[in-house]
Amino acid sequence: MFEQLNQPGLFGITNSNRDFTKKEAWGKNQFNNAFPIALACFMFSQNIKPIYIRLEKRNIEHNYFAVDQVFQINPLEAQAFFAFEHSYHPYTELIIGKTPAIDVVISNLQNSQIINAFEIKLTAIPDNTTANLPDNLQGCEIVIRPDTIVYLALSIAKVFQQNPLALLDILDPVCARIGDWEDATSIQPMIPLFCELLYTIFDRYQAVQIPILLQPIWKTQGKLSILHENCLDLFVWSNFALAKVFLDASIKPSEKSITRPERTTVWLIKMLYDFAQNGKIDYKRTLDRITFNLKNDKAFAASGMVTRKYMNSPELQNPRIKRHSIKHIIINGGQRYLSPERRLDSAIVSTPGLFEEIL
């Protein structure tokens, strides 16, 4: 549509709750979750499949997974609708209170069916911890917010919606021993047991793990704000694989205070245990009360030194989308709406010749 009308836009995002012909649709948060969807649509048009990170017998496994399989709809069809920063209503019946917003909810306009929802993390490679290392050792930092863990819990609870007792049978032998979930002293020794409980769930229900997080990467020339020639690619995390990141950081508890990954493990167990007992998740109560004196601005963060072992692949070292393709993703002058003070925007604006036509 944008191509036909010669108006600013993003590739493939024809129907959405944003108007990309207007500058206000290109703000910081808007660009960070809309550009990745346009990237996914462009990759689909080029028959380039994202890397799907999933769990296989407690180990990370990579597969190639087409965008229409991830989204469960052809993203370029007229009926595909993208609602950004929206609640995912299929989880409403599993939760007490309002379902938190997620980065994108995908629906089918033809039958009004809500199809899927994803968190999105647009990440730069290399990050500060790996910028001085060779390409094969570089990685990108990922920061996970608490609401992502809520959606992770809901995605697992949904599996047990018709049979919550199956979940209770797994969790109750350990969780019933907890007298005070807010007491760090009594909770900390239990965290390795919580990790094992979650792995038990993942082992038994491995076949039903689902994509939950889209992680586009954009590569720069070292620490410079100039895009690498091979600059863009897309990784998709399953809910179980994402959980493994904080479980790996929790399975050997810290000797001092509870860490963010450990608290995230406790959050997930508590929400699932509440669901197993009551059929509902009171996520606000869990997040607000189980703090262990840590701020709630994020669930946890993992540096490039950590994430590379989960993401290590030819695509991480050499992303498949060339930088000259960006002019086919940001179209009809949309780059003029970008804010150069932000890092990806700055790299796009600062990279010479990016939007010039190749003769």
Curated annotation (Swiss-Prot):
Enzyme Commission number(s) from the entry: 3.1.21.4
One MF annotation (Gene Ontology) recorded for this entry: DNA binding
Protein name: Type II restriction enzyme HgiDI
Gene that this sequence comes from: hgiDIR
Organism: Herpetosiphon aurantiacus (Herpetosiphon giganteus)
Alphabetized InterPro entries for the sequence: Restrct_endonuc_II_HindVP
Reactions listed under catalytic activity: Endonucleolytic cleavage of DNA to give specific double-stranded fragments with terminal 5'-phosphates
Pfam family, one: RE_HindVP
UniProt-listed GO biological process terms: DNA restriction-modification system
Keyword tRNA-binding: no
Signal peptide start-end: none
Keywords: Endonuclease, Hydrolase, Nuclease, Restriction system
